[in-house]
From Swiss-Prot:
Record: active site: D113, H169, S256
Protein name per the record: Phosphatidylserine decarboxylase proenzyme
Alphabetized InterPro entries for the sequence: PS_Dcarbxylase (IPR003817), PSD-B (IPR033177), PSD_type2_pro (IPR033179)
Keyword Lipid metabolism belongs to the record: yes
GO terms (BP aspect): phosphatidylethanolamine biosynthetic process
Record note on quaternary structure: Heterodimer of a large membrane-associated beta subunit and a small pyruvoyl-containing alpha subunit.
Function: Catalyzes the formation of phosphatidylethanolamine (PtdEtn) from phosphatidylserine (PtdSer).
Source organism (scientific name): Clostridium botulinum (strain Kyoto / Type A2)
Length: 295
């Protein structure tokens, strides 16, 4: 059971997890863990499932998925009949009015839909992942000199579950450098998996780029792959002018994570998100929603 904080109701909700029985069996049973290490965490498994989700045969999964997880299709640019395969649906675009962007340059917005954790006063040797599990920031980005620039800074971890809108966006005007890709495995990023696999983010496939934002300094913008995420697709053009809310990219099928790192004294995260993170709870947010401000 995954409990998270709902800002609208000021109360806790229970997340409806896609494939929850499978996740619990895989990460909690000896047989499941053996299968995970031998096959499921490997690129080959995710490529096979990604191949299926790219084929017309997978179209029959769409209606059931929409009904099971009560996805509001009125927010989407396309109707169900427009999608050629499940990945077309999974990477669906939303109408512009579905995710309004705060124009105020001092307002920090969420880069995507999902559940967010926030940690300030970053310790580079011990970044909290979830459920008290820690990892090294040095190991995560594999660049010691760059990592040192973010000592005592702020980290935001946005977890996208399979039922979420899976495109991620820029949080400010600016320019973004080329993407750096780090190979790894394809563990699930669900809290069930995070509690079982130490330093999971450092073991999974991930990509990052330096985003030179106009109002929040140089931000490390990272995407972490997960089980069945066949691809992390970057749609932005490096080193060109970017505007707040512009699309950066999207994930194909699977749960995924976006991580942002800010330098010291650049942002102030909203108190409710910080307080819930201290208690060990994620907060539900949508793309474009204010989550903090310029310091």
């Amino acid at each position: 059971m995954i409990k998270y904080y709902n800002r609208k109701t000021n109360d806790y909700d229970i997340e409806k997890v896609a494939g929850e029985k499978y996740l619990n069996w895989t990460y909690s049973s000896p047989m499941g863990m053996n299968l995970l290490e031998i096959f499921i965490k490997k690129k080959f498994f995710s490529k096979i499932y990604g191949f299926y989700c790219d084929r017309r045969l997978s179209h029959n999964k769409i209606d059931k998925f929409i009904n099971d997880f009560q996805i509001d299709m009125s927010l989407c640019e396309n109707q169900t009949s427009d999608f050629k395969c499940f990945n077309d649906f999974f990477t669906r675009k939303l109408k512009k009015e579905a995710r309004p962007i705060k124009a105020d340059k001092n307002i920090l917005i969420s880069p995507g839909d999902g559940k967010i954790l926030a940690y300030k006063n970053l310790n580079l040797n011990s970044v909290t992942e979830v459920k008290g599990i820690n990892y090294s920031f040095y190991e995560l980005i594999n660049n010691d000199s760059l990592a040192k620039e973010y000592d005592n800074g702020t980290c935001l971890i946005l977890r996208l579950c399979p039922t979420d809108y899976h495109r991620f966006h820029f949080i400010d005007n600016g320019t973004c450098e080329n993407t750096i890709k780090l190979d790894g495995f394809y563990y699930s990023v669900n809290p069930i998996a995070l509690s079982k696999i130490p330093s999971l983010f450092c073991k999974n496939k991930r990509e990052y780029a330096i985003f030179h934002s106009e109002n929040f300094g140089d931000v490390i913008f990272m995407e972490v792959g997960a089980t069945c995420v066949g691809s992390i697709i970057q749609t932005y053009k490096p080193n060109t002018k970017i505007f707040k809310g512009d699309e950066k990219g999207y994930f194909k099928f699977g749960g995924s994570t976006v991580i942002l790192f800010f330098k010291e004294n650049t942002i102030k995260v909203d108190n409710d998100i910080l307080n819930q993170s201290k208690l060990g709870y994620e907060t539900s947010v949508i793309m474009g929603e204010p989550i903090g401000s310029k310091k």
